[in-house]
Amino acid sequence: MREALNTGLIDFLKASPTPFHATASLALRLEAAGYQRLDERDSWATVPGGRYYVTRNDSSIIAINLGKQAPLQGGIRMVGAHTDSPCLRVKPQPELQRQGFLQLGVEVYGGALLAPWFDRDLSLAGRVTFRRDGKVESQLIDFKLPIAIIPNLAIHLNRTANEGWQINPQNELPPILAQVAGDERIDFRALLTEQLAREHQLNADVVLDYELSFYDTQDAALIGLNSDFIAGARLDNLLSCYAGLQALLAADSDETCVLVCNDHEEVGSCSACGADGPMLEQTLQRLLPDGDTYVRTIQRSLMVSADNAHGVHPNYADKHDGNHGPKLNAGPVIKVNNNQRYATNSETAGFFRHLCMAEEVPVQSFVVRSDMGCGSTIGPITASHLGVRTVDIGLPTFAMHSIRELCGSHDLAHLVKVLTAFYRSRELP
């Protein structure tokens, strides 16, 4: 099971260079398992025991396994994650031709570690909107090949590089795509038109706009003397998306189960398809009776907010509270913050710990040092919007928000096992 899950995760990461591709990858796997797509613009005719999914903005997705009994009886088991990761996004008018090189201007998306983006083989993917035969259409593209690089400045010209280097995103991050001769001008949108023709065999009249991200072309991989680790891009938080999907499909539960994977978590979640938007609430309102029954159902439900945790790094152990240093390959982490940066409380933490103990899955705890600030997740946002009880958990990770992150190769199986048990649980606290 562990080997198959790890291989599946690596394949999923490769197929999901952007939130758009991640959502499409999740939808493809759901459809293969018998889930039917619901269009938000149509009326829905759902039945008990039915399996459905809905997307918004092509970058967020909710999968619903409607229980055979009414949700009011047993409540709803929800797992939440996010599809986006810090990256470099292409600007609307990006062409830069300097010193005989074609470069693209980029904007930093989210709280990225910037130094690892240098000297990497980069490709480009995302969504392109274009006009064809008088109609406006959108399509996903992925160049796949390494088409760009951000070369470092040689240490001979930057003698203090190893003493602390503050990167200027405006000046230092535009990737190089090509060498150009003389006054030759390159039209980036024409390049996108060519890519649409290559990848989808369609002839766009004009590219109107796009949402494109650079990404590292190096595939995720098992590494270490004993293959103890998985190294790869976007583990935060596609690792949790994939774990939630595998648990949902494995559970085959008679209870009502939901998997929600939102976009825009890394930039605050405040969007139509983010956790701070109405997507989940509107979806549940369409599936559940109104008024009193809706509120009662939510109050009988529980959400597991799954987002990676900070594993204790052997070179930087002092960055953790001495009693709360999550270890890689030692199981999922219950995340606690008394200032509500995480939504965990004693009841939800206790129930998750109970599930782990019943499934013989190791479990850990994390609280940030008292002299450091704490990050957050979709957990508190979803809890405050829905009023649903929530526990924040995640798998320990190194190098979070780097271009290449690291997790334990045993932990995915741990998380899938306990999330499957959660979806199958007959009673919620």
Curated annotation (Swiss-Prot):
Q: Give the signal peptide, or none.
A: none
Listed GO molecular functions? aminopeptidase activity; metallopeptidase activity; zinc ion binding
Q: Which InterPro entries match?
A: M18_aminopeptidase_2, Peptidase_M18, Peptidase_M18_dom2
Q: What is its EC number?
A: 3.4.11.-
Chain positions recorded as Zn(2+) binding sites? H82, H156, H401
Gene Ontology BP terms: proteolysis
Cofactor list: Zn(2+)
Q: What are the UniProt keywords, alphabetically?
A: Aminopeptidase, Hydrolase, Metal-binding, Metalloprotease, Protease, Zinc
Pfam families in the record: Peptidase_M18 (PF02127)
Q: What class of enzyme is it?
A: hydrolase
* Gene3D superfamilies according to UniProt: Aminopeptidase i, Domain 2 (2.30.250.10), Zn peptidases (3.40.630.10)
Any one GO CC term of this protein is: cytoplasm
Q: Which NCBIfam families match?
A: PRK02813.1
Family assignment from sequence similarity: Belongs to the peptidase M18 family.
State the name under which the record lists this protein: Probable M18 family aminopeptidase 2
UniProt source species: Pseudomonas putida (strain W619)
